[in-house]
């Protein structure tokens, strides 16, 4: 208890976030050419558009739905997400961005073409809709630093016919400045809300990632693979052990010095890092940080810092997301 009181007192002295995060600004060589590559993973919390999709259960997130998801709220959220992405880039744009919980094509289209991000020229792809609510993952990239070669998505086989389909896993492969091919997998594993009944589906999702990574390792002479997204499990969870067995290495998410947060997600009075990055192959100087700014946080009823989310239950709260993003960088001379 004394330790807790000390930490709580420090929280009220220090600002919620941190003003600088070192290497997150793009590092450049003497001739001005970027010599680092930066990648971001962000669960953006129910980034629905405002249009009815007759093929998916998105009725709650319509203007007349239970969440009263209006055009004004959609535009405001897109602007907030754009602010986060821009701030994560610092002096230059993040090279590759992975997003969880985006609906269809119109939501990411607005984000990358109708906000302050439009001037940066991002291109993106988004998965199809296996998820019953139409929630997808997306990957966006800077064409100058990531030249797309191909993209594809993978459905997760259902362990039982009675289970609902889950989100697809997205793979984008591109050429980077070093001349190497970088393979980026974006995932959003099934929720933990189903308890043990959802375990088989989560295991099937992990096996799908392992299968894709195995194939990439066999077809690449020098594989450089990044797997990222919302794993809905901590890095040491037994369900993620197959990732390690497949040769993937977890990249620990560092909390910025002076920050009051303890991970990417706050649940039941505790922080955890369910948003993760894993790598296969050589990535020189690979580092990963939780990206946080004051405006992305608020205090809960106990006075603790938590993500400033868009909704609290069914009530509109007007924040950014219930997750904090990860930003990682590595040097381009492998």
What are these regions (language model features)?
Residues 1-23:
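Bacterial Sec-dependent N-terminal signal peptides
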Residues 18-115, 125, 129-135, 207, ...:
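N-terminal, active-site-proximal structural segment of metallo-dependent hydrolase catalytic domains
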Residues 20-31, 211-225, 232-334:
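Metal-dependent phosphoester-hydrolase catalytic domains
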Residues 38-46, 150-152, 181-191:
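Active-site-proximal beta-strand elements of phosphoester/diester hydrolases
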Residues 45, 102-103, 188-190, 231-234, ...:
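Catalytic metal-binding/acid-base residues of hydrolase active sites
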Residues 102-181, 189:
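Structured beta-strand-rich core segments of catalytic domains in phosphoester-bond hydrolases
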Residues 104-106, 132-134, 192-194, 232-238, ...:
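Active-site environment of divalent metal-dependent phosphoester hydrolases
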């Amino acid at each position: 208890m004394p330790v807790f009181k000390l930490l709580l007192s420090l929280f009220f002295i220090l600002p919620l976030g941190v003003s600088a995060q070192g290497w997150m600004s793009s590092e450049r060589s003497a001739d001005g050419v970027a010599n680092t590559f930066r990648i971001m993973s962000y669960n953006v919390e129910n980034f629905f558009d405002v249009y009815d999709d007759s093929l998916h259960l998105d009725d709650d997130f319509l203007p007349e739905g239970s969440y009263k998801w209006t055009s004004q709220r959609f535009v405001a959220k897109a602007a907030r997400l754009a602010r986060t992405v821009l701030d994560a880039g610092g002096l230059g744009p993040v090279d590759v961005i992975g997003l969880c919980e985006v609906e269809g094509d119109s939501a990411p289209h607005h984000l990358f073409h109708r906000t302050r991000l439009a001037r940066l020229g991002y291109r993106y792809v988004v998965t199809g809709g296996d998820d019953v609510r139409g929630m997808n993952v997306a990957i966006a990239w800077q064409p100058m630093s990531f030249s797309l070669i191909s993209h594809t998505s993978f459905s997760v086989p259902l362990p039982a016919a009675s289970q609902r389909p889950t989100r697809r896993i997205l793979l984008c492969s591109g050429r980077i400045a070093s001349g190497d091919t970088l393979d980026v997998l974006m995932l959003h594993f099934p929720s933990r809300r189903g308890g043990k009944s959802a375990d088989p589906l989560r295991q099937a999702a992990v096996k799908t990632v392992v299968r894709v990574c195995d194939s990439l390792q066999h077809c690449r002479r020098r594989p450089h693979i990044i797997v990222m997204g919302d794993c809905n499990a901590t890095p040491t969870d037994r369900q993620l052990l197959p990732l390690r067995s497949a040769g993937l290495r977890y990249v620990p998410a560092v909390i910025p010095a002076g920050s009051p947060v303890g991970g990417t997600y706050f649940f039941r009075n505790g922080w955890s890092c369910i948003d993760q990055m894993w790598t296969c192959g050589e990535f020189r100087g690979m580092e990963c940080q939780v990206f946080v700014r004051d405006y992305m946080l608020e205090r809960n009823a106990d006075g603790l810092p938590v993500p400033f989310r868009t909704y609290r239950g069914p009530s509109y709260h007007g924040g950014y997301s219930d997750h904090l993003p990860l930003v990682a960088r590595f040097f381009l001379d492998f």
